[in-house]
């Protein structure tokens, strides 16, 4: 509840920064790093990459609003202070972006399933999400999963291991692409 409320406050704050978080650019960036360090381990990578391009093209065509978005809305980045206030920390990925990306990132960082993601959207919107809103959130879940899978593959090439995280993120990409197609 507090995470959703804090994100909504951020998104409605009117604060701006001079840079954006561009998921297409970030995917290309980590894809390049992976290619330079041995490539990816996914047999169906070309197919999944094509699906991600499709989602990015659909989102671009929607011309969604850009507001200050945190991007790294993992539970550990929400500080609950003794006075009852909530503070967001760790702003390294923050930039101007579609605000619904923060809901998607919160869902994948928390390993939410579809039911928990639905509840998160209901809290954020204060109502049942519309089909188009659900499609946008699911698209960003797929894209976020794909991005963080690439990030983890690159980090693994440097000797860091993340256990099942890489596969969980890649699975989000594949699963939520299919969910978008059903909407």
What are these regions (language model features)?
Residues 100-129, 142-160, 172:
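Active-site activation/catalytic loop segments of kinase-like enzymes and analogous catalytic loops
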């Amino acid at each position: 509840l507090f995470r959703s409320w804090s994100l909504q406050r951020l998104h409605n704050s009117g604060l701006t920064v001079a840079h954006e978080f561009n998921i297409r650019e970030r995917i290309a960036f980590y894809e390049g790093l992976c290619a330079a360090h041995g490539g990816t381990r996914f047999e169906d990578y070309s197919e999944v990459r094509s699906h991600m391009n499709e989602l990015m093209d659909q989102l671009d065509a929607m011309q969604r609003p850009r507001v200050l978005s945190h991007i790294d809305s993992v539970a550990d980045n929400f500080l609950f202070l003794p006075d009852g206030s909530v503070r967001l920390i760790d702003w390294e990925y923050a930039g101007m972006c579609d605000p619904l990306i923060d809901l998607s990132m919160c869902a994948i960082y928390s390993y939410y399933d579809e039911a928990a993601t639905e509840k998160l959207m209901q809290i954020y919107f204060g109502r049942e999400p519309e089909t188009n809103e659900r499609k946008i959130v699911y698209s960003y879940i797929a894209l976020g999963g794909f991005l963080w899978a690439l990030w983890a593959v690159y980090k693994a090439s440097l000797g860091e291991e993340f256990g099942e995280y890489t596969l969980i993120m890649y699975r989000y990409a594949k699963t939520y692409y299919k969910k978008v197609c059903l909407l």
